[in-house]
Amino acid sequence: MFTEISVNDIKDFQLGHASNKEAGTGVTVIYFPDGATAGCDISGGGPASRETPLTMPMTADNPVNAIVLSGGSAYGLAASDGVMTCLEEHNIGYDTGAALVPLVCQSCIFDLGYGSSKVRPDSAMGYEACMQALKKAGITDSDTCASDNTEPVQGCIGAGTGATVGKIMGMKQAEKSGLGIYSVKAGTFTMTAIVVVNALGDIFDHETGEKLAGLKSADRTEYISCEDALYQFMAPRDMFTGNTTIGAIITNAAFNKAELNKIASMARNAYARCINPVGTMADGDTIYAASTAKRGDSEAVHVDINFAGTLAAKAMSMAIKNAVMNSKISDEEFLSMIK
């Protein structure tokens, strides 16, 4: 019914990354050359986000220009300042009559326990990632960023640079994760899932049930169950910090904001299939859903919302798998980066 394709084959959006490998943090910008209608689902108890009300059905129906994913927890929200500056410099944004205001949504992961907690995504890093996305879109030929047409790197890049999983017993028993991408096509219909996996829980293959990454034993020689570890803490305690899985579903099919909110919530099923435990008060789990279909286009792609939502969950499940499988590093390297 549908086939996997390279995200490079899709021109309705472009990705830009900025990564600080030494500090263990970064930014990913999803830029929409023609804007996008967007929805959002927030299921975690501790989200760090910016301008998510733009995705709500009761707010003005203006297309967003970019979605930003980053590290840095709430500090990382500063990255959108640089994204807005970059877009404004290229005359991209909502025309208020007095000025152009780029419409940018953002969500962050908590990666302050990996690398340096004093170095967080800032305006300059957001600007760099946005410039890379604009260069891929052919809007700028600036040499201030590196960009080519090769397959985008997955794993420890952009917002996934400092992502980790299986942290219920602390970082010494956790494991590296990162950013994953999965794109599919059915006729003229396309869908892409992008995710940064930074979960409290373990990560599983949604098809086989195999544990792919997560909580390890104290000597790091074997995996142990994060769910079983959680059950040791029946009494309330403030110990579960440093998590959040954030992502986006992007399609060229035409949907309104209410429908995209539903698609985002259906895509959340991927988190339940692949992550356990998930959606805790220590997670800020968020999924955006965006449609790049042009408003009023008589030739826009139309598909059933149930088809789109179900496929979104499958694509997100595959992206989660790609995120952890492309982020494997040695125990020695991992332990050198944690507090």
Describe the function of each predicted region.
Residues 1-339:
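Alpha/propeptide regions of enzymes that mature by internal proteolysis
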